[in-house]
A protein has these predicted regions:
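Long, low-complexity, polar/charged, intrinsically disordered or flexibly structured peripheral segments
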Residues: 161-241, 248, 254-257, 262-265, ...
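C-terminal helix of von Willebrand factor
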Residues: 380-395
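Short acidic-hydrophobic, aromatic-tinged amphipathic segments that line or gate anion-handling sites
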Residues: 286, 374-383
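Active-site neighborhood of HAD-like aspartate-dependent phosphohydrolases
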Residues: 2-74, 90-93
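Conserved phosphoryl-transfer catalytic core
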Residues: 50-185
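Substrate-recognition "cap/lid" segment bordering the active-site pocket of phosphatases
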Residues: 218, 222-250, 257-327, 333-344
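Alpha-helix termini
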Residues: 22, 58-63, 102-104, 247-251, ...
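Acidic, Mg2+-coordinating phosphoryl-transfer loop and its flanking beta/alpha structural elements
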Residues: 262, 274, 328-376
Length: 395
C-alpha cells in the first residue's frame, strides 16, 4: 500500500506523500485542523473520561467496585474505527449498554422494578435513587470475579465494525430479545435518557463533570455538578502542536490561512491550546459543542452537523475565503469520510492523517494508506517540513 507514497524521515517516524497527489498538494493554500489527536493529545482526558464515567455509573448502581481494567482501551478504539463514533458520549453510552447486558438477569429484573419509580427525576437523582435500592443485589466482588468474562464480551461485541450509536443499540436490542431480557434493556435505555438535555442525561452529565471538573462544568452548563469532581481530566491534556509549527505554516501560507474544525467547545480548546489559538483565523474556528449548547444542549439536534458530516470543515473554509486547495489534517476514519463528503460539495479538499500518537499506530498508518490519504504524518509537527519538500518538488 505504501508503494504509492514517497517516504520522508521526520521527527517521530515516517511521513508519506501520495505520489499521484503531488500536484494537488503543491497548490495547498489553506489548512484546517481537527483538534483531538492532532493539535491536542486527549488520550488521558477523553479516553479516561469514558472509562471513569462507566465505572462511576456501575459502581454507584451496584454498590460493587468496578475496576477500570474491565473496559479495555481497545473497545473504545474499535468503536471509533467505524467512523461513526465522533461523540465520546456515544461511545460511553454504547459501552454502558453493553456492560448492562453482561449483568445477571436477576439484577436486570431488580433494576426494571426500581426503574418504574424513577420517572421525572434529574439524572443525578435517578442514579442516587436507583443505587440506594439496588445495593446488595450483587456480591461485593462480582466485578473482580466476572471481570475477564465481561471484558471478553465487550471485545467480542466491538470486534466487527458497528456503524454508529443507533446501529449498536439495534444490535443490543436484538441480542436482548434472543436472550430474554429485552424489557430490562429497554428500561435501562430509558433510565440513561440519552440523548436529552444535560440535567436529564446520566451519560452527558457524568462524562462532562469528570472531563471538565467543577469550574468549567459550571461555566458551560450554568449549574453545579453533583459528583464533587474538583479537577477535570482535561487538565491532563497536552498540546501536540508546537508554536514553531504554527509559525512556520503561517509564514508559508500567509496570515489567516489556518482554520479549526472540532467537536469540542471553545472553552475546552482554549484551556489546552492557549496562545496557539492566536495563529488561527478567529472567524475560521468552528466549535460544534458551542453550537450544541446554542441548540439547548440537545444531542439529537446537533447530529446532522457532526463528523463525518462536513459542516464544520465547510464552515471553516468559507470563513478563510479564496481557497483553491485545502488540506484537512485529522487522525481518524471519520476524518477522511468527512473529506470525501466535503469534496462532493466543493472538490478542493485533500486529507492528511496523523498516526503516531494513537493506540495501534501501525494499524492507523495502514488505514490511511488504504483510504488513499494524500499525506500521512506521524504528528502535525512534521507538516511544515513535508510541505516544503512538496512545494520544492519538480514535476
Amino acid at each position: 500500500m505504501l508503494d504509492a507514497y514517497k517516504e520522508l524521515r521526520v521527527d517521530g517516524g515516517g511521513a508519506y506523500i501520495r505520489l499521484s497527489s503531488l500536484e494537488n498538494l503543491k497548490a495547498v493554500d489553506a489548512i484546517v485542523f481537527d483538534c483531538d489527536g492532532v493539535l491536542i493529545d486527549a488520550r488521558r482526558s477523553y479516553d479516561a473520561a469514558i472509562r471513569k464515567s462507566i465505572q462511576h455509573i456501575f459502581t454507584s448502581l451496584t454498590g460493587c467496585r468496578m475496576p477500570l481494567s474491565i473496559i479495555p482501551i481497545d473497545v473504545i478504539y474499535n468503536l471509533r474505527l467505524s467512523g461513526g463514533f465522533n461523540f465520546d458520549w456515544d461511545s460511553t453510552y454504547v459501552i454502558t449498554l453493553m456492560l448492562f447486558t453482561s449483568l445477571p438477569k436477576d439484577f436486570q429484573k431488580a433494576f426494571s422494578e426500581v426503574a418504574q419509580r424513577l420517572e421525572g427525576k434529574t439524572a443525578t437523582q435517578r442514579l442516587v435513587s436507583a443505587s440506594s435500592t439496588l445495593r446488595g443485589k450483587l456480591p461485593k466482588d462480582y466485578f473482580q470475579r466476572e471481570g475477564s468474562k465481561i471484558k471478553q464480551k465487550l471485545k467480542q461485541l466491538t470486534k466487527t465494525k458497528i456503524a454508529d450509536k443507533d446501529a449498536a443499540v439495534g444490535l443490543l436490542l436484538q441480542l436482548a430479545e434472543r436472550e430474554g431480557y429485552l424489557q430490562h434493556l429497554r428500561d435501562f435505555i430509558r433510565f440513561l435518557n440519552y440523548p436529552s438535555e444535560a440535567k436529564q442525561s446520566i451519560i452527558s452529565t457524568v462524562f462532562d463533570e469528570f472531563f471538565y471538573g467543577a469550574e468549567l462544568f459550571k461555566q458551560i452548563y450554568g449549574f453545579k455538578g453533583e459528583l464533587g469532581v474538583k479537577h477535570g481530566l482535561i487538565e491532563k491534556e497536552e498540546r501536540i502542536v508546537s508554536l514553531e509549527t504554527l509559525k512556520a505554516l503561517t509564514e508559508m501560507l500567509g496570515e489567516g490561512r489556518l482554520g479549526l474544525a472540532t467537536g469540542r467547545g471553545s472553552l475546552a480548546a482554549k484551556k489546552t491550546l492557549g496562545e496557539a489559538l492566536n495563529y488561527f483565523n478567529s472567524k475560521a474556528m468552528v466549535f460544534l459543542e458551542d453550537l450544541k449548547y446554542k441548540m439547548g444542549g440537545r444531542d439529537d439536534l446537533i447530529r446532522p452537523y457532526v463528523k463525518p458530516e462536513p459542516y464544520s470543515l465547510l464552515e471553516a473554509v468559507a470563513s478563510i475565503g479564496g481557497t483553491n486547495a485545502v488540506l484537512y489534517v485529522g487522525n481518524s476514519s471519520e476524518d477522511f469520510i468527512l473529506v470525501n463528503k466535503a469534496n462532493k460539495v466543493k472538490n478542493i479538499f485533500l486529507f492528511a492523517g496523523c498516526y503516531a500518537l494513537q493506540n495501534h499506530s501501525g494499524k492507523m498508518l495502514n488505514l490511511f494508506a488504504e483510504a488513499k490519504a494524500e499525506m500521512i504524518l506521524p504528528t502535525v509537527n512534521a507538516l511544515p517540513k513535508v510541505l516544503k519538500v512538496i512545494k520544492g518538488e519538480q514535476g
